[in-house]
């Protein structure tokens, strides 16, 4: 049913706003509510004045599973630049939803990236997606635990965009008075630098 608010009783809520106006001359807004898994998805086609839930916690068929118990860790949503009725949702993998009917809004989901495939596959995107940004040429950049992936055809094909940098995500860091530093990293173990390696920038796993 339509209402004026997206329920706030969720550990995490991600919002997205369309870059263009829809056929009613309003911006479309989307909200994805999660705990460890999907709670609900909501849409507004009138600049946020009213909202309609189009997916509940039970979700679509059982093969649909975006978050796989990680909904508070990885969740992101974006509206495609040229279609206010189509969104991409990032969790473990990237999924697409497109509205196909109105009153109430309803549509279908399609998985458009696959973490389980070989990294050489054009459908491969690393797991745990955290950020999505479009550029002026409608290329989508997705930031995840493996770095950055990009698509220039709305998810039909994906390419790695990791060039010339070494990064990791730290959850905790400690250091001593002499400048030695240790950190616990996502998927990269515990890294330590006591300035005894060939450069001061080098860390070793301990």
Enumerate the language-model features and the residues they cover.
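Beta-propeller blade termini and top-face loops
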Residues: 1-206
């Amino acid at each position: 049913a339509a209402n004026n608010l997206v329920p706030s009783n969720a550990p995490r809520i991600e919002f997205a706003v369309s870059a263009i106006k829809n056929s009613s001359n309003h911006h479309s807004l989307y909200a994805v509510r999660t705990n460890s898994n999907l709670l609900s998805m909501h849409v507004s086609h009138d600049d946020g004045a009213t909202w309609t839930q189009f997916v509940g916690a039970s979700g679509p068929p059982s093969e649909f599973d975006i978050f796989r118990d990680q909904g508070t860790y990885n969740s992101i949503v974006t509206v495609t630049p040229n279609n206010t009725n189509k969104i991409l949702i990032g969790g473990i993998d990237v999924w697409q939803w497109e509205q196909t009917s109105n009153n109430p809004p309803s549509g279908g989901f399609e998985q458009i990236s696959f973490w389980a495939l070989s990294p050489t596959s054009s459908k491969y995107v690393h797991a745990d997606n955290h950020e999505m940004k479009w550029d002026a040429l409608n290329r989508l950049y997705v930031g995840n635990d493996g770095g950055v992936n990009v698509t220039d055809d709305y998810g039909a094909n994906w390419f790695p965009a990791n060039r010339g940098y070494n990064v990791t995500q730290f959850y905790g860091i400690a250091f001593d008075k002499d400048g030695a530093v240790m950190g616990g990293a996502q998927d990269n173990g515990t890294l330590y630098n006591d300035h005894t390696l060939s450069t001061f920038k080098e860390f070793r796993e301990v």
